[in-house]
Amino acid sequence: MKKNEKFDLKLILIWPIIASVITIFLEEKNIFYQNFFVSIILFLALPAIYLSFRAKQYVLKTLIVSTLGSIPIMIVVEYLGQISGAWSFPVSIFSFKLFGFVILEVLFWAFFNMYYIIIFYEYFLDHHITKHLWEPRMKYLFWGLLIGFVSFLFIIFNFTIPVIPYFYFFFGIIVFAIPVILQFTIYSHAKKVLVKILKASAYFFYLSFIYEIVALHYGWWGFPSENYIGWVNILGVRFPFEELVWWIMLFALAVLSSYEFFDDNEK
């Protein structure tokens, strides 16, 4: 690892703590009211933008993959999650909601979360520069997402969507668990890739855990339902077991597993 990369890694490693300290200071001193949107900037956007300046060669590809892979899926997931009461966002700075349910902050959250994961992975671990921005496999992801999203629009405009019991549990299996299981079984021979994915995921476990604790403490989001398979009580906050497994533990693993399959080289 180069000297500048070592410095950047040290900065990125302590950034979740810096973001938390800034949040606590601003909240306790009543200097500035924090909200979900501001938290996205602090915990995700700022470090992602910083790495973008340090790793310009990966930015365009990461932008394309993150936009394609986050926005359509998040709209569908958020719509169904809100209907089913899987989670809630008490405050939004935007009065407009997509399709009456989807706040715009979740789209920023999904995009910057995915973007940060991929740019971190490329800059610190993968170092894979390609001459083209679109791998052949990406067309399958593109068409799959397009067909899925158009089908979603057709359904919500023509039918009443029912409440889905234990929605968080079932959607997590499809979106997070399956990509990770496939990556670690079908591509078990690609040990170097698996190690890199695990290293990146370890950092995002640490980041997401801190982010979760701070977010729940200040009420940036919550979990109003009882349709969860269990609860985690820690450091004065309470969140579903699904949140621990799907987002905190497996989100980065799922993103990078899908990224390696569709738009990287599995090497």
What annotation goes with each model-predicted range?
Residues M1-K267:
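Aromatic-rich, lipid-facing transmembrane alpha helices and their immediate juxtamembrane interface loops
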